[in-house]
A protein has these predicted regions:
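Surface-exposed, low-hydrophobicity beta-strand/loop segments enriched in small/polar/acidic residues
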Residues: 1-175, 187
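Extracellular repetitive beta-rich solenoid segments
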Residues: 122, 170-204
Length: 204
């Protein structure tokens, strides 16, 4: 058995999927819908086949409205003999909806504070983030809040979105009094259109 011969005196900066600080945040429990051992902590994920229940790594065709958040390392998974941590298919996993977290980034990226946040949706880096827009990325509601840490991670902040805005159903305005000068021109599923002028409403 080999022995460790070198030791670092520096504390690593950031671990993929670790919360950046204790500022306001929300973590939802989701089920890993990947069939292999491809899910990792610190990846951006999208809705699976059961929105609000499971998540998967983004692929071609993924859209920002399906973005669920970033997988959180709850420090409950053991390393294997090679030092790797895997998330089993069907396992429950925390997903950060909003807040600050260390996320996986494209290996060649060098983000800076305030850079926009783009999720890579194709290729070997799918699920990682980058500061650069491209044909293989979608912009998600957030930003980089610091430079690259130890390894291919960087601190990011996901902005709060109501459930209605993120496409996960529910939330948003719950009464006409919450609306003001809104014209919903897209028919609802039952074929009705709600128009609210601020003083009255009509259904067509």
């Amino acid at each position: 058995m080999s022995a460790q011969t070198t030791y670092s005196q520096a504390t690593p900066r950031g671990a993929a999927g670790a919360l950046y600080d204790l500022s306001a945040h929300a973590v939802n429990t989701r089920i890993n819908a990947e069939t292999g051992l491809t899910m990792k902590f610190g990846l951006g994920v999208v809705q699976g086949s059961a929105p609000g229940s499971d998540i998967k790594i983004p692929a071609t065709g993924a859209t920002a409205i399906k973005f669920e958040g970033i997988t959180v390392n709850g420090y409950t998974n053991e390393m294997n003999s090679e030092g790797a941590v895997f998330i089993s298919p069907g396992a429950a996993i925390g997903v950060l909806q909003y807040g600050k977290i260390w996320a996986r980034i494209k290996p060649t990226d060098a983000p800076a504070y305030g850079d926009k946040l783009y999720l890579i949706i194709t290729g070997e880096n799918a699920g990682a983030f980058t500061k650069t827009s491209g044909a293989d990325t979608i912009e998600v509601p957030g930003r980089f809040i610091g430079e690259k840490g130890t390894g291919d991670v960087a601190p990011v902040e996901l902005f709060y979105q109501s459930a209605a805005a993120s496409g996960s159903g529910g939330g948003g305005a719950t009464s006409l009094g919450d609306l003001s000068d809104v014209d919903l021109t897209i028919p609802a599923t039952d074929g009705q259109v709600l128009k609210y002028s601020g003083t009255d409403s009509t259904g067509a």
